[in-house]
């Protein structure tokens, strides 16, 4: 069954105001009266909805659906600006894997340099990608996107998290294997966890020092060196095993 995220309150009848969503529903998918879809409103609750008026783009809400697929903890993925379209790939995949927020920051060793204007366009593009991935993976929410123009603004946000894990390849080389487990252990439902990943060139010693000063722990992600766009996927997959599949 098709799923769509819609703005506003869950009150029948629901009129689809967003032009792109409406186009996909009634021109691409060719929905007709009495067809049913899943609508997700701002409250994150899924509801079964039935088309009652194609021309008016209206649905009636049939029932709430007990289907919460979100991770039990809120995970933010923060990546140093990578080259090309790697952040688009990261956004799509970590959305599918359950991230609540997706952040980007200018790393000391980032090759990509984006000013305010470019960042605005990038955010718009990433938001569309996150929306599509959230619909495809039947999420209850769409991850929020934030790209920081200044690293100082990013660092100022770190105090808001219950736990911070920095993916650091030097830790992997040293055979470290327990930091990720320790960082996740004991986190209660709804806790806020931040994963920080470097760009292609990795994280500088100065950045590591700044993150550790904020209480971050350094964690290796297995014995192999992962690409900038692969590491977030590994981390979220491992986290899912720890907080979902083992319970």
Predicted features, each with a name:
Residues 65, 171-172, 223-226:
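Short, acidic/turn-prone active-site loops that include or flank metal/cofactor-
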């Amino acid at each position: 069954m098709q799923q769509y995220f819609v703005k506003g309150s869950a009150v029948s009848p629901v009129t689809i105001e967003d032009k792109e969503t409406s186009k996909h529903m009634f021109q691409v998918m060719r929905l007709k009266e009495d067809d049913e879809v899943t609508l997700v409103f701002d409250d994150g609750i899924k509801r079964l909805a039935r088309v009652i008026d194609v021309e008016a783009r209206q649905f009636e809400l049939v029932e709430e659906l007990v289907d919460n697929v979100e991770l039990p903890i809120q995970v933010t993925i923060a990546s140093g600006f990578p080259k090309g379209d790697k952040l688009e790939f990261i956004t799509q995949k970590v959305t599918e894997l359950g991230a609540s927020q997706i952040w980007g920051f200018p790393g000391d060793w980032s090759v990509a340099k984006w000013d305010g204007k470019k960042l605005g366009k990038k955010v718009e593009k990433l938001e569309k990608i996150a929306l599509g991935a959230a619909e495809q993976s039947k999420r209850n929410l769409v991850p929020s996107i934030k790209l920081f123009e200044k690293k100082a603004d990013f660092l100022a946000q770190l105090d808001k998290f219950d736990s911070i894990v920095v993916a650091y390849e030097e830790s992997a080389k040293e055979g470290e294997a327990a930091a990720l487990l320790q960082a996740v252990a004991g986190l209660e439902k709804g806790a806020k966890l931040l994963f920080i990943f470097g760009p292609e060139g990795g994280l500088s010693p100065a950045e590591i020092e700044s993150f550790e000063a904020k209480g971050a722990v350094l964690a290796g992600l297995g014995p192999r060196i992962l690409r900038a766009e692969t590491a977030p996927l590994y981390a979220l997959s491992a986290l899912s095993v720890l907080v979902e599949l083992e319970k």
